[in-house]
Amino acid sequence: MKTFIKLLTGNLKALTGLCILALFLFVAVFAPVITKHAPDKGTGYPHEYPAFVVKAAKNNPDGWIAKNLATNKRTLMMSRNADHVLGTSRMGRDIWSQVVYGARTSLFVGFGAGILVCFLATFIGVSAGYFGGKVDEILTAAMNIMLVVPQLPLLFIIAAFIGQAGPATIAVVIAITSWAWGARVVRAQTLSIREKEFIKAAEVLGESPWRIIGVEILPNLISIVGASFIGCVLLAIMTEASLSFLGLGDPNAISWGVMLYNVQTSSSMLVGAWWEILTPCIALTFIAIGLSLLNFAVDEIANPQLRSHKGMRRWRDAAQQQAKQTPSNSTPTDTTPQHS
């Protein structure tokens, strides 16, 4: 375990992804502390400029920011207090507060859907791979059906049927439609592990099937389930943003997708309110980059064939260090000459 943690902390992709994810988690947890305005209340004039734009335009009226980012003098006059870090929306809501509280919704949907997907995929995949027979046939048929049905159109249909779905409903819908691929991968790995000698030995000793699954099989699936979980979190966050942007989510909720939906309905880009669309897009981009880097790092550590040259050197150095710490059990060879 120490070797794995050392390799994880020595991986630049993993460190970068963890730092980005930790930043979003910090923002989501301490949202009431780092914001001064309510995200769902109008606390300013419509489309106030961000504070840094207002201050830069006042300090240097002939500068690049004043000429390119603060071109509307009327809006600049309404923003003279510079009270909003990232400006306001068409309804006068603080963009910074919406982004911070939107991180809560996005992470809730992402991790909630990820946990549900991993539970369903692991349970179904392990059951199909270990028990075989009719159980495998039925569960494999269900996997194939879910894989054949296009996921996004199915999501849109279910979300439209439900109506204005909240974050929890969207997480459940994503989980119901996204478990099949992970279950297929887990099933294939379970079929391979089932033929190992330690599984046969456990069966001969009379251990129950569920104990074998919990004690012998599941620990060998941690890397696959972990990578699948990170991928599901990323998929769920992006899917929630897409559904909310298309108007299939709850417009009263605070999320990055709802922010983009409000940008579309209020024609913010037509009036030059670039900050209203840029902020949630940057947030979605960075959370996607962080989770993707973390996913790549987990794959690299778990799968030797995906490791880079630097990764191979880290594994080689760790193996050599572990070999030095392990006492040698070999017996010295007899060098005494034999007389004929």
Describe each model-derived feature in a short phrase.
Residues 1-118, 122, 263-280, 284-294, ...:
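Gly/Trp-centered helix-boundary motif
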Residues 1-5, 88, 93-96, 100, ...:
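Alpha-helical membrane-protein architecture signal
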Residues 31-39, 129-133, 158-164, 177, ...:
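Short helix-capping/hinge motifs at transmembrane helix termini and TM-loop junctions
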Residues 85, 106, 112-196, 224-226:
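Generic hydrophobic transmembrane alpha-helix motif, especially the helices
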Residues 104-120, 210-242:
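Transmembrane alpha-helices
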Residues 147, 160-162, 190, 231, ...:
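Glycine-rich helix-loop "coupling/hinge" segments at transmembrane-helix boundaries
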